[in-house]
Amino acid sequence: MSKDRMVELLQEHFELNLYEARAYVALVAFGVLTPAELASVSEVPAPRTYDVLRSLEKKGFAMTQPGKTNKYRPVHPANVLEKFIQDWQERVKEELEAKKKAKEELLELMAPLIETEVPKYGVERVWVVRGIKNSTLKTKEMLEEAQNEILLADDGFIAVNLEDDIIKAVDRGVKTKILLTKNLLPRLKASKIIDYAKEGKLELRALDKFDLPMLICDEEVFFALEDLAARYFNYETQVWIKDHRVVALFKEKFNEYWEKAEKV
């Protein structure tokens, strides 16, 4: 029913509870109601009507009509809903600014902890990362911190979704080689990666397929463990290693793929 849908929308998007939403719909339908009348035409329990109507008035959805009997009329939906959205936008804007300031303050406060040369619980050289969100954050971190070299063998995520981070690294002067599976090329047709390859700012090649996708940034390597079920549910397990010996082994594999690949 349309009434149920109206109640649902008011609850979901305009911060009214169930009884408030039902009461407001009834007010819009009937125009002016006393608490007793509201109880008879809506599904708001009689003992709750006074509190519900006062709450609607406080939230700006209803107004009291002067007289001997308490009567309430609705504020026009176009007015109250637009006002709600404007207030919400302002509130979100303020919250966003507050979060940005908090982020900057936290980064400033944590800088000494990050930059300290004292090892914390030993030198961590191996991390296991699970889930697409965490993997994306780690990949972005590696691309942002790369100074000399990026070697990327990608079969479906990084080049398409983290193009800006790759381009920024190239613009910083990081030497970059990207190896893609050929099925990705149509998705990158209009990307800066293709443009940069044509301009010689990075090297780009393609293969039909390869068994071991990887990202190497300087002395770090990041790769996924083979688990088709986990990949289906976006919960792949990936491993990050910082060890020049391990990186050398992965570079050998990357170069093996690179030699077989076609220039794009």
Swiss-Prot record:
Provide this UniProt record's keywords sorted from A to Z.
DNA-binding, Transcription, Transcription regulation
Q: Which organism is it from?
A: Pyrococcus furiosus (strain ATCC 43587 / DSM 3638 / JCM 8422 / Vc1)
Q: Which InterPro entries match?
A: HTH-type_TrmB_regulator, TrmB-like, Tscrpt_reg_TrmB_C, Tscrpt_reg_TrmB_N, WH-like_DNA-bd_sf, WH_DNA-bd_sf
User: What job does this protein perform?
Assistant: Binds to the maltodextrin transport gene cluster (mdxE operon) promoter and to some other TGM (Thermococcales-Glycolytic-Motif) sequences, but not exclusively.
Pfam family, any one = TrmB
On the tree of life, the source organism's domain of life is Archaea
What family is it from?
Belongs to the transcriptional regulator TrmB family.
What GO MF annotations does this protein's record show? DNA binding
Domain text from the record? Lacks the C-terminal sugar-binding domain.
Q: What is this protein called?
A: Putative HTH-type transcriptional regulator TrmBL2
Q: Which residues bind DNA?
A: 33-54
